[in-house]
Regions:
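Short amphipathic alpha-helices and their capping/turn segments at secondary-structure boundaries
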Residues: 30-46, 139-152, 194-202
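Terminal-tail/helix-coil boundary detector
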Residues: 236-263
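A short, acidic, flexible beta-alpha connecting loop/helix-capping segment that sits on the rim
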Residues: 210-220
Length: 263
């Protein structure tokens, strides 16, 4: 079968690249460039990716980091991504970095570091997923206020954070069910999606609201059934007029002066 043959070829190439970091990097760059073209061909204007990680292993500041380590890491990250960003620009597609633990772009400050190193490349955008913010105790609502111009993709995923005297953000290597921070099915967690949808609508977000499900308790079938309805119930139909338009009697300079007692 052609698909089996193709899959076999992929596995062989993966083994080859696994032993050759340079070839692996070249292959990965080519895949992203192809993804830019594929997105254009599909009529998409945004594509999601992870940033990768040079300095994530040093996210905790002890042992003390050498001066310049973080700066050098982000310079190299931007150096590798800039040609790819240029390719996405040629194809008219934004590249949205999912702000995610394990990646160098894991919060607002790291996103800003990267953006600066790319010289504010116009295709550097963001995928917004509040579940990754609540688990690190980042204010996911004010994040929208700050970065709404960059948010072009949206994962609708719920989560909860219930710290105890035994574990907090780091989780103590516990299984998902026993972690203080864990992903939940939509509506079962702590995330304020009414406020999120309101803010995104307020700022004119016109991308997809994509259901992402990773609950450690509920079945995926139930999560999908409930989640699709949850999203539909939260999507806001934007009003074309203000609530008090009915009271507008018009205005002119003479009328305004009369109201102010200047006539």
């Amino acid at each position: 079968h052609c698909l089996s043959s193709a899959a076999s070829d992929v596995y062989k190439r993966q083994e080859e690249y696994r032993k050759n970091p340079k070839k692996r990097t070249e292959w990965a760059i080519n895949q992203l460039n192809l993804a830019a073209k594929a997105s254009k061909n599909l009529g998409l204007n945004a594509h999601v990716t992870f940033s990768g990680a040079f300095v994530w292993p040093y996210v905790y500041p002890w042992p003390q980091r050498p001066n310049g380590l973080v700066e050098t890491g982000f310079k190299e990250l931007a150096k590798r991504w800039t040609p790819i960003l240029d390719e996405f620009d040629k194809n008219g597609v934004d590249l949205c970095y999912e702000i995610h633990p394990g990646e160098d772009l894991h919060d607002g400050l790291t996103f800003e570091r990267f953006l600066e190193q790319t010289k504010n490349h116009n295709r550097v955008k963001m995928l917004y997923d509040p579940s990754h913010y609540i688990l690190q105790q980042l204010d996911y609502l004010s994040h929208i206020d700050i970065y709404h111009d960059y948010i072009k993709m949206f994962h609708v995923k719920d989560a909860e954070f219930n710290p105890s005297g035994r574990a907090g953000v780091y989780g103590g290597y516990a299984d998902w069910v026993d972690r203080p921070g864990r992903f939940r099915s939509l509506g079962d967690g702590q995330i304020d999606f009414k406020s999120i949808f309101s803010k995104l609508t307020q700022y004119g977000f016109d991308g997809w609201a994509v259901l992402e499900w990773e609950c450690c308790i509920k079945s995926n079938e139930q999560g999908a059934k409930e989640g699709s309805k949850f999203i539909l119930d939260h999507i806001i139909e934007v009003t074309e007029k203000t609530f008090d338009d009915f009271a507008d009697s018009g205005s002119d300079e003479k009328g305004i002066k009369k109201i102010l007692g200047l006539d």
